[in-house]
């Protein structure tokens, strides 16, 4: 008897595939920074409003992820890092991803406006548009400054959280925006240093592809030098304090040490050890952002006991 095997037929999408479509790792950062923005605002927010606000912000983040995955299907199919995502792997159809993204976008924006306020909903709508259209459809494929300008999309969540609580913006919410905005380039350029071939194969004009690794290393250092004083200065805003200052000094000292190491690295050495330093800097940058926002949250938690703030 002949053994007939049928290959190339995509498996039916399951619950986990639809969760992956929403980019849960990115969503976790969005939820955390938005939650910090909401909780440290100088007003009392009803727990139900806070819960629903964060829920719809998370939904908006997931919608952005689905729209991005729909548009980037051709790129994601080529890149090793992304080829197993639901859309490029064929598990979820592109049209289905588009429909889910649009539906969740509408639900998230409308419900956030009804549950909290129109300003917060407007910020969320702009964030989804900026990420899905300005970044994904335009910047990502046209300029090596894609993540510099596009980084604004990931920087809005704490502002949205603050707006849920207060209905507006402030120096503090703008600082949280700026912290993420300035953090984004060194974070993603360190990734691009050891993923250059992926971006090159997909035709994405990352800085490593258009200008080479040596220029990218210099940019990591320059943006780290700009980020460090900004991060430390946050200690002297209304959401800062001695705990945040100590945390920021330690983290930014380590950031600068790492950035200098990356800048001074010889390419032959980096290839020989498979970009060990660059991968370490990339992982550290994730902890860097979470710990800064954790310190901001800790300052707010300590204030009722007379321990937080100055």
Swiss-Prot record:
Pathway annotation from the record: Porphyrin-containing compound metabolism; heme O biosynthesis; heme O from protoheme: step 1/1
Protein name in UniProt: Protoheme IX farnesyltransferase
Enzyme Commission (EC) number: 2.5.1.141
Pfam families: UbiA
GO biological process, one term: heme O biosynthetic process
Entry GO CC: plasma membrane
UniProt cross-references to NCBIfam families, sorted A to Z: cyoE_ctaB, PRK04375.1-2
Organism lineage: Bacteria, Pseudomonadati, Pseudomonadota, Alphaproteobacteria, Rhodobacterales
Record note on quaternary structure: Interacts with CtaA.
Bilayer-spanning residue ranges: 26-45, 49-71, 95-115, 118-138, 147-167, 174-194, 220-240, 243-263, 289-309
């Amino acid at each position: 008897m002949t053994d007939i095997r049928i290959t190339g037929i995509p498996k039916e999408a399951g619950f986990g595939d639809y969760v992956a479509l929403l980019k849960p790792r990115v969503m976790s950062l969005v939820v955390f920074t938005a939650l910090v923005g909401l909780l440290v605002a100088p007003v009392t927010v009803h727990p139900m409003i806070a819960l629903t606000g964060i829920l719809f912000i998370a939904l908006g983040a997931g919608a952005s992820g689905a729209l991005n995955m729909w548009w980037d299907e051709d790129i994601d199919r080529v890149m090793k890092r992304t080829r197993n995502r639901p859309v490029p792997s064929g598990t979820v159809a592109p049209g289905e991803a588009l429909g889910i993204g649009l539906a969740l976008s509408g639900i998230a924006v409308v419900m956030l406006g009804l549950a909290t306020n129109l300003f917060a909903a407007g910020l969320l709508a702009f964030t989804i548009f900026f990420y899905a259209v300005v970044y994904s459809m335009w910047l990502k494929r046209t300029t090596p400054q894609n993540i510099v300008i596009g980084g604004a999309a990931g920087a809005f969540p704490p502002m949205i959280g603050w707006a849920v609580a207060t209905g507006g913006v402030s120096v503090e919410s703008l600082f949280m925006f700026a912290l993420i905005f300035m953090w984004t380039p060194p974070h993603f350029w360190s990734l691009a240093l050891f993923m250059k071939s992926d971006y090159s194969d997909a035709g994405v004009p990352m800085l490593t592809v258009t200008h080479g690794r040596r220029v990218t290393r210099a940019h990591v250092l320059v943006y780290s030098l700009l980020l460090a004083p900004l991060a430390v200065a946050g200690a002297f805003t209304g959401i800062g304090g001695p705990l945040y200052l100590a945390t920021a000094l330690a983290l930014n000292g380590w950031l600068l040490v790492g950035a200098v190491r990356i800048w001074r690295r010889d390419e032959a050495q980096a290839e020989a050890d498979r970009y060990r330093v660059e991968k370490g800097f990339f992982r550290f940058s994730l902890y860097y952002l979470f710990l800064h926002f954790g310190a901001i949250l800790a300052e707010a938690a300590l204030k009722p006991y007379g321990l937080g703030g100055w």
